[in-house]
Swiss-Prot record:
InterPro entries: Alkaline_phosphatase_core_sf (IPR017850), ARSB (IPR047115), Sulfatase_CS (IPR024607), Sulfatase_N (IPR000917). This is Arylsulfatase B. The lineage of its organism: Eukaryota, Metazoa, Chordata, Craniata, Vertebrata. It comes from Felis catus. Binds 1 Ca(2+) ion per subunit. The conversion to 3-oxoalanine (also known as C-formylglycine, FGly), of a serine or cysteine residue in prokaryotes and of a cysteine residue in eukaryotes, is critical for catalytic activity. It is an enzyme of class 3 (hydrolase).
Amino acid sequence: MGRRGAASLPRGPSPRRPLLPGVLPLLLRLLLLPSRPGAGAGADRPPHLVFVLADDLGWNDVSFHGSNIRTPHLDELAAGGVLLDNYYTQPLCTPSRSQLLTGRYQIHTGLQHQIIWPCQPSCVPLDEKLLPQLLKEAGYTTHMVGKWHLGMYRKECLPTRRGFDTYFGYLLGSEDYYSHERCALIDSLNVTRCALDFRDGEQVATGYKNMYSTNIFTERATALITSHPPEKPLFLYLALQSVHEPLQVPEEYLKPYDFIQDKNRHYYAGMVSLMDEAVGNVTAALKSHGLWNNTVFIFSTDNGGQTLAGGNNWPLRGRKWSLWEGGIRGVGFVASPLLKQKGVKNRELIHISDWLPTLVKLARGSTKGTKPLDGFDVWKTISEGSPSPRKELLHNIDPNFVDISPCPGKSLAPAKDDSSHPAYLAFNTSLHAAIRHGNWKLLTGYPGCGCWFPPPSPYNDSAIPSSDPPTKTLWPFDIDQDPEERHDLSRDYPHIVEQLLSRLQFYHKHSVPVHFPAQDPRCDPKGTGAWGPWV
């Protein structure tokens, strides 16, 4: 065919001729035809956006970080995409999820203290415009599957009222993987109530007892993918229950890890493997149904691993609930055929609050309807390797911090500042806070458990404590050179300390009051048998 076409071309210049009647309209019609699914992916329509959020996955809980827990699907995706090696989340569930969906620091939403507990009349402020709302405005179909944990005391707080077309999952922070029940103490009633926490849309879903949640969520996610028309932009937020406690997993996932003698770590490893398999099933569905070539796939944890429940962040210091690197250094990567660079490790500073402006820009939407954002559009940083627009990161300021899982022998009370150094006048260093600027990080107050936790083994299952005195309230580190936070540089760089304290004071001055209301006994699910809105 090609040769015959070439032979038919005129050998010399031919005179210009007017287009034959009807040819011009035909060309116009051809130009206006919609492109075939998969053709010119990304050039003519916004990409599909799939965000998978793991729960309590630690730095040392994936094999691409050297763990003996096998994560082949995550490894393959990270190796073929962009591994985020200087990526941060918050140290707890609600704060990370709120910053993901608002693009704003906790100090600007009132959620800077702990999490939203089952009976608290609280949720992400209703005047905040969330990521799914912005994507809907940009023409996306929006689905959420899994853990919400952003408040549910009134119906206006529910996912389906905050921008998601569909929702399937649970509203609180944790529950049984099989019964899907959550037990919680209602203080004012002096009773512990156990009730179902599972929803399909806004309706209680009762037909899933004895079904493992990760499998159910994966099935729903893949069903949404397979029924989705490729020409319509999709946003799928899959917030897995894995690998948050309780430590539960089908028996067959335990057998490959019989060599792990620590019981918590043994179960946890099986849970990670099942989660890895789930991610593989989701990406397989995207590929088999023609969506992958125009998909940006993001994987992230919500905080560091909880060493009390099998997680591990070695060699990083600390764990979930803490502002040490082990509590906030995120496991994350981006995989997509649309990336301009692939198979690279990105060392630029990126935070979970950056996803909102990044994804809205990719969606060709607008953030004009939001309150002032703390996040940055980092797509060029990820896709092309450009310098990150983020130079500074406020990890948090919590004036009411109490560590509910302190190191052995540590006090629950925050540390008291015993220093008279003039630079300390810039900020009250007894406050639980941390900030990052460039390669510098400063922690103040009591940051949470500051031990190092080696992976459990037959020879070593104990934490390595720090030698810091209990009155210490200030720690500056060069994180690029010292990611394990072992070398306090306060004596060597007092001017850096002073500058970072001034920045903390700036943020503290511009923060809103902490919103952490007392329990409301009307939350009691005794009458309905299910947790849900009560106002």
